[in-house]
Design a protein with these regions (language model features):
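"…centered on the first transmembrane helix and the immediately adjacent amphipathic helix/loop
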Residues: 1-66, 84
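Helix-loop junctions at the membrane-solvent interface of multi-pass transporters
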Residues: 29-30, 101-102, 129
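Internal alpha-helical transmembrane segments of multi-pass membrane proteins
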Residues: 71-86
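Membrane-interfacial alpha-helical segments at the cytosolic side of multi-pass membrane proteins
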Residues: 55-71, 117-133
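Interfacial helix-loop-helix junctions of multi-pass membrane proteins
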Residues: 34-40, 92-120
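Hydrophobic, aromatic-rich alpha-helical transmembrane segments
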Residues: 45-50, 77-81, 108-112
Length: 146
């Protein structure tokens, strides 16, 4: 991948991340009067919890692309991914706490649980990809050294 393409890709990922965060804020704090009834569960899971899961699942993936994470060691990969998870959890908690300050939304611990499960699941995907990259990088370094 060329350097110019890489720079363009990272810039696009950063713009996508900002748009994504804006959309999350809009969905979490928007005042929607004409929404359909969300109380009917799908496979036993309330629809609003599914929406929370879908809404927060992309966070670590888009954030990792926007931050251009390319760790050289396993420990650094774990640390970077942990920071993504902590930031995602903080944003999810802030949205739920913030909803308590509105007169048209109610904060819910179960919404946060749905957010947490999405963040943990996608963080594990990001961690797996980064660990594979570190392993390949170590192999390439060892092969070129010999």
């Amino acid at each position: 991948m060329g350097a110019k393409f890489h720079k363009t890709f990272v810039l696009a990922a950063r713009i996508a991340f900002l748009v994504y965060v804006g959309m999350v804020v809009y969905v979490c704090f928007g005042h929607f009067d004409d929404l359909p009834d969300m109380s009917r569960p799908i496979w036993g899971i309330p629809q609003d919890k599914i929406i929370h899961f879908i809404m927060f699942f992309p966070f670590p993936i888009i954030a990792a692309l926007a931050l251009d994470l390319r760790p050289a060691r396993y420990g650094k990969a774990f640390l970077e991914v942990l920071m993504l998870l902590v930031c995602g959890l903080a944003i999810a908690a802030a949205t739920e706490i913030g909803q308590g300050f509105t007169d048209y939304r109610d904060p819910s611990v179960w919404d946060w649980v749905a957010d947490i499960s999405a963040l943990v699941g996608s963080t594990l995907i990001v961690l797996t990809v980064l660990l594979i990259k570190v392993r390949r990088s170590c192999r390439n370094t060892a092969a070129s050294a010999s």
